[in-house]
């Protein structure tokens, strides 16, 4: 050490000596490349640092600051491109087409009249897509039963309809949902608003299709808007981080007064991607929040979203295997199915425990249970149009739902949920805007519109690629002839295109006015 200290070497001299050798140059280059590579990815691991990983604190600006500039620049560019596309002139819908879409919707939403509503030729494009247009206005009739003090929408990850069908019952995947629906109400001719969690939640909460995920608003058709006006404390409770699809920002823009994500529920989460298990989520909602005032609670689960990290053995939710008679051609890997179905069983059990606990504490509560979209883990890779699209609508609340039921021949989707809940909770004379139906009101020729699918009381139509129409599974003796299929496909296309076109233009005009 004394010899080394007696002959000090400057840093430039050391670097010069080191770089005289090819091995040193190579080593330095590799180290520098690794540092740059890891820096750009943001972490050491199989997956680069993503926006979902940044929701680790309760402060959004601090969260975004954890991401590297390259990633933030790319994210900003993607959002800019999305907004540019949303407001592109090429997406504008011609006046005549818009008027025809409006005529289809007005006619569909007012079937009790014997005359088809006429859209005046002089009507401007702007009036049809204004939230204040008379055809979109509703006046609540007053709740037919006891008004709920607390409303809970359990927006369950991939909680679809097919496990409720009798032929799959022995799998035992949704026994809690089945029991609650047997004691309450269940609608199986029902569709999600979209085929992804984010966009489906936007339809459910905003009561309209095609809203802009990058710029949300508290619009007149929305659930948050209505329940704020009705005096409820509006809560948005999520089993994932605040930056997952910007869920915290979106909820606040929609008008929710309270927003809870992983950072508030359990900092760090339960999984590798900062999700919290459904047990943690529902325990937070039941034990950490107060209910001394009327509340509207939108709860989004995440356990049935990969990666599946629930300890199924500890939760006693393991699936032994797929019964022989349910095995079919094109069946997926059984080990993967068992893992997925065990997680679904766990998620279903957690929602059941939560509902039972809360209804005991707050008997004047209403619970709405539905899936965000159809699942991704069918037994076969080619499910039919019903099993590959539908989610159930379950409503539970003995004191609130006493004496009411879904009329025979009812079909619906997430876009109808706002209207249905407002009519259950609002006093007579309450005014609101809506493009949906009240599912408790008899409705001739009922229907439900989603993304690429339209459901009717006895059939479902898939509009992807070559359109297809099949009878619903419980319509055992019903067979559709070619003419009936053609008529339903044509009707489905009209309704689907009208809902999405009107929704897009209403949202676009509203945002354009807000940004001026």
Language model features: what each stretch is:
Residues 114-516:
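Solvent-exposed soluble domains appended to multi-pass membrane proteins
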Residues 1-149, 166, 170, 174, ...:
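N-terminal secretory/membrane-targeting segments
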């Amino acid at each position: 050490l004394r010899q080394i200290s007696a002959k000090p070497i400057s840093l430039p001299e050391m670097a010069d000596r080191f770089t005289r050798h090819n091995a040193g140059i190579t080593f330095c280059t590799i180290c520098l490349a690794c540092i740059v590579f890891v820096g750009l990815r943001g972490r050491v691991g199989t997956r680069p640092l993503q926006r979902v990983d940044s929701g680790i604190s309760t402060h959004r600006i601090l969260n975004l600051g954890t991401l590297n500039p390259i990633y933030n620049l790319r994210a900003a560019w993607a959002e800019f491109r999305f907004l540019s596309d949303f407001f592109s002139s090429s997406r504008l819908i011609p006046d005549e087409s818009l008027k025809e879409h409006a005529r289809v919707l007005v006619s569909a939403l007012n079937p009790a009249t014997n005359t088809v509503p006429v859209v005046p030729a002089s009507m401007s494009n702007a009036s049809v897509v204004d939230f204040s247009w008379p055809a979109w206005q509703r006046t609540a009739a007053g709740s037919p039963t006891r008004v709920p003090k607390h409303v809970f929408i359990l927006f369950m990850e991939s909680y679809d309809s097919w496990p409720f069908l009798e032929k799959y019952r022995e799998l035992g995947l949704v026994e809690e949902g089945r029991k609650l629906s047997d004691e309450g109400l269940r609608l199986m001719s029902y569709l999600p608003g979209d085929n992804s969690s984010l966009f489906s939640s936007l339809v459910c909460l905003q009561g309209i299709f095609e809203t802009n995920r990058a710029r949300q608003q508290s619009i007149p058709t929305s659930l948050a808007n209505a329940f704020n006006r009705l005096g409820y404390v509006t809560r948005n409770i999520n089993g994932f981080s605040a930056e997952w699809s910007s869920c915290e920002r979106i909820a606040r823009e929609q008008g929710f007064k309270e927003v809870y994500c992983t950072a508030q529920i359990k900092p760090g989460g339960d999984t590798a991607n900062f999700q919290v298990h459904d047990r943690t989520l529902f325990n937070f909602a039941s034990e950490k929040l107060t209910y001394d005032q009327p509340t509207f609670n939108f709860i989004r689960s995440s356990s049935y979203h990969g990666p599946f990290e629930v300890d199924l053995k500890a939760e006693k939710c393991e699936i032994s295997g797929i019964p022989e008679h349910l095995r079919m051609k094109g069946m997926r890997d059984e080990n993967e199915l068992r893992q997925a179905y065990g997680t679904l069983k766990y998620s279903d059990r957690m929602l059941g425990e939560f509902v039972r606990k809360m209804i005991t504490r707050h008997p004047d509560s209403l619970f709405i249970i539905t899936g965000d979209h159809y699942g991704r883990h069918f037994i076969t890779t080619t499910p039919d149009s019903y099993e590959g699209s539908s989610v159930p609508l379950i409503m539970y609340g003995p004191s609130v739902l006493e004496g009411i039921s879904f009329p025979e021949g009812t079909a619906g989707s997430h876009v109808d949920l706002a209207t249905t809940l407002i009519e259950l909770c609002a006093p007579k004379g309450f005014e609101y805007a809506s493009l949906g139906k009240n599912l408790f009101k008899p409705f001739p020729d009922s229907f439900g519109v989603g993304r690429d699918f339209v459901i009717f009381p006895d059939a479902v139509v898939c509009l992807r690629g070559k359109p297809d129409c099949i009878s619903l599974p419980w319509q055992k003796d019903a067979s559709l002839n070619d003419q009936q299929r053609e008529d339903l496909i044509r009707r489905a296309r009209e309704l689907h295109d009208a809902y999405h076109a009107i929704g897009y233009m209403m949202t676009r005009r509203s945002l354009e006015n807000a940004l001026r």
